[in-house]
Amino acid sequence: MKEIEALKEQYPLVNNLIATEEVFWVNPNMEKYETAIKNSPLNEEHVKDAEERLKRFAPYIAKVFPETKETGGIIESPLVKISSMKQSLEKNYEQPILGELLLKCDSHLPISGSIKARGGIYEVLKHAEQLALQHGMLTEKDDYSILDSDRFRGFFAKYSIAVGSTGNLGLSIGIMSAKLGFNVTVHMSADAKQWKKDLLRSKGVNVIEYEADYSKAVEEGRLQADADPSCYFVDDENSHDLFLGYAVAASRLQKQLEELEIVVDEEHPLFVYLPCGVGGGPGGVAFGLKLLYKDNVHCFFAEPTHSPCMLLGLMTGLHDKIAVQDIGIDNVTDADGLAVGRPSGFVGKTMEPFLSGNYTVSDEELYRLLKELADTENIYLEPSALAGMIGPLNVCKAENEYLQKQQLTEKVKKGTHIVWGTGGSMVPEDVMNGYYKKGLELTCK
């Protein structure tokens, strides 16, 4: 307990976290891009390598997932302006949002309907490629659509893949691994939604359920893989491959911004708000964006008030050496994708010099925002995907120290805010109706 008292004294915001209040934190350790990138374990070459690999797999993806045919086997999501939602937020919060507001709809990514379709699918594809190359069954010059054959499925069936997940990562790893022919086991934490487990089982995935939280599910997945040399473990807490799969999103987003004639430069800053669980998804996307836009992009992570693991790890500098449970927070939230008590140390340390800040949002707020987005834009997201939505309001507050510190108070008016909508299109209709109803009840209170 002594250590916790010392933390509270050193970082007064810890008291607000313990009280599960909504907070906004500006990262004092952010550095200029050129300084930060020099010490980074990853760089542009790593992201380019991931991009090339996804291009090699595109013919296979287009063949086995017809919903990606139109995009030539590239798994990508729309970027849309949400002007009606912007007006609604300004009215409800009695505060202007300076600049344009857009939504990146990773909720509608093909195959698994969430941001995890980026990193999760990429890591499985990379593993499959390595196995096939090692065994002389494939060369990088081949048309990868040959993977859709009994020969390859029979080969991959000798191997297994394991992952621990609160839901969405399990969906992407499970669906992709099963499609290739791997034996796949998803270790699901207590907060994983039933429909996600049902969907995985319908695809032939072995789902193991736990009463404990996310960290336990990951630990069990790791143990399974350790005991079996033919089993590959997708390590959501430490994986560079997952991170790089997410980072590829940046160059795709750049093209979409250009198509919308949206400029990003020193006079037109870009602000991006990313829901954060263990950190891989938002960390990878933010890293990719920093590589492209350097000091002209400002990335913020958003977490539930009951699971602020990354904020706690970054603020105290303890990273994965501290969990929210250590300071008495229960890690119980309806934002199942973000219900993580201990952050990734790899992501925290990698992103510390690049990240602008972090904030928390209550479950009640997520439901209200869910209902509002459905009403104004007819876009339905799952609760955790709405965490980014109050980011622009936080940043545009008159007293926001970040804008002042970065001399953006005037520039923000010509800037762009992108809220990353991380999941939702695969939520069954009855479940989504329940979410909407809850949002309606909370709005009427």
From Swiss-Prot:
Keywords: Lyase, Pyridoxal phosphate. SUPFAM superfamilies: Tryptophan synthase beta subunit-like PLP-dependent enzymes. PROSITE patterns: DEHYDRATASE_SER_THR. The modification N6-(pyridoxal phosphate)lysine is found at residue 116. InterPro entries: D_Ser_am_lyase, Ser/Thr_Dehydratase, Ser/Thr_deHydtase_PyrdxlP-BS, TrpB-like_PALP, TrpB-like_PALP_sf. Pfam families: PALP. This is Probable D-serine dehydratase. It comes from Bacillus mycoides (strain KBAB4) (Bacillus weihenstephanensis). The gene is dsdA.
